[in-house]
Amino acid sequence: MTGSGLKSLDTTQLPATSRGMFASSSRLVVCLVNEGLMQATYLPDVSLAPMDGLGSVALLTLQDLSIVVSLAHTPQIDEQGAILFLDRLDLQYPIFVGTMLTASELPAQLTECNCPSALMRLVAARMDNFDEMLLKQLCAELDSSVEHMSNLFLHPHPEPTLNSTAIEWEQSIIEGQGTHPMHKSRYAVAPVCRVKPDTNTSKLTLTLVSMPADAVVVSGEFLTIMAKLLPADMVPIGRVPILVHPFQVPNVVSMFPEATIHPFTVLALAQSSLRTVIIPELPNYAFKLPVGIRVTSAMRTISPWTTFMGPRMIPILDRIIPKSKVLKYAAEHSSVSAKNSNFDTARHLACVIRDDFSATLREQNEAVIVSAALTECPNGDVARVIKICNLNSQASRVEFLSIFVDLALKAFLVPLIEHGFSFEAHQQNTLVRLTIPQPGDNSPVYPSGFIVRDFGGVRVHQETLFKSTGMRVPVLPGNPNEVTDLKEAYTRLYHSLIQMHLHRLIRALDLHYSGKGWLIVRTKLEHYLKPGDIGHELWLSSETCKWKCFIRMKMKELYKDYLYRDVPNILLYKGEGRELIHQGGEASL
C-alpha cells in the first residue's frame, strides 16, 4: 500500500509548540529506527481510531514499549515487513505510545506523546545501564531544540527572495538539519548562561579581549585584518586582540585569567551556524568564533587543529579544486588560538577569518544562498527552491536537479577521486550560486555553481594527495582530518553530499518517491565511478551504506569519532513500492 489512509493533521495548522515538538520527535523516531535502537515493523492496513480509515503505520518496539506513528509513504522494508530505513517526511502527526502491542492488537489503547524528551526517557528506561546524567543532558538538549524551534515557528524571519542578501537567507532557516533530533538545540554549558528562545541570536554585540602575544598562536593576516576594525592604540603592544561571541564571555573570563576585556564592542550579524558572523564594516570577511553551546552533535568551539590547518591548506585547495567556475572556496586565511596543550581549553578562545564572496557576487548579479535554506518548507507544502526558482513543472525540477548534481559532482567528487580529498559538503557548508533574473522574467532559474566553506570537517588521504600534487595537508598530531583508509574519505563524502545534501534536495523537488531523482544521481555518478573503483564499490555496487548514528554517538559522548550503522543505500532507491530488500547491520566505529 502506498501512503496512508489514516486521518492526519496538517502540522502547519498546529500550535507552534506542537509543531516544534513534532519537528524534533519525528527526527528522534527516525534515529531510533535507523540506528537499530528499536525494532520497527511496517503495518499496511491499520486503523488507529474509529473515525480513521485504513492506512499504514510504523510500529516500533523495545521490550514492553511500543511507539506507533502513521505513515504518509511506504518506507524501505524487508520481506517480513521490518523497516530498514525511515525518513521524517515519511511520518505523519501525531506519535502514539503504548505497552506490549502487536500488529494484531491495533487499534489499541494508545496515548499521544509528541514530546521528544518524554519519548527518550521511555526508551532509555528500557536500555541497560543508561547513564542518568547523560540522559538528563540529552533530554535537556531535546527540550532546548523544541523551545527554539517553537519560537521560530511563532516568529519566523521574513521570507527571502532571489534579491535578498546572503545573510538574510542564512537567517531565514527554520528547521535546519534534516535528520538530527537536536537540530535547533541551543544548549548552554555552564558557565555560559541559558539561551532563552526569544534571545536575538541573529544580531550580536561582540566583545573585544586581548591576550599576551606569547599566549596565543597567530596565523595568516589576522593582525592586519583586526587593525582595519579597531581604533589605533586600542590594544597595547605585545598583546593580541581577539573578538569574543557574547555567549562565550563567561568561558573566557573563567578559563583565561590573562585575558583583558577592552571597552570596545562590535555589532555583527550571525550566519546559520550561530558562531560565524559577518561584521558590516568588513563585509568581505566572515568571523568564526567559539561558543560554549551545544548545537546538534557537539559544543560549537574551535579546535587548534582547525585554526592551524585552515591557513596552511590554501595552496592545496588552489591545486585540487577543478579549474572552472563551478566551485569557489571561502579561504580560511587567518586565525588565532589560545596556546594551551589542553585542546579542550584552547578551543574556547579562538577565531578563524575566512573570505566571504556574497557581496562581490551580488554586484555581479549572482544570488548566494546557503543550500539548507532552499529546502525549507515554511508553509509545510512547497519548498522554497520550487518557489523562488520558478520550478513550476516536473520538467523544470528535473532539469534543476540534473544541473545541480552535475555541478556538485564536479565540485566535490572530482577532488576525492583525483586527490583523496573529501570536503564536508553538507547543506550548511555549501552555498548555491544563482543568476538573478531580470524583473518580469519568470523562467526557471538554475544553479551556476557553489561556494564551499568550513574546513574543520574535511577528510584527506595524505598518500593519494601526495601522489597527485606532491603536497600534504599540514596538520597537528591527533587531528581528525587524516584518514589511513581511502574508503573513510568516500564514506565521509557520501554522508555529507549524498545523505545530508542531495537527499534533502531531491525530496524538496518532489523527485524522491518516484525514484526519478535518484535515477538522475546514479546516471551522473556512472560517468565518474567505474566498476572496480573504490567509489563504485561503496556507492553504486553495495546495497548498504554507512549511516551516522547521532543518538548512539550522544550515548557514547562522541564528537570527533563517528559511529555508523549499515542501512539501505539510498543511491539505489528505485521509488516507492520498488524498495530494495536486504538486511541492515550492527553499529560499529
Model-derived features: positions:
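Nucleotide/phosphate-binding site architecture used for ATP/NTP-dependent chemistry
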Residues: 1-407, 435-589
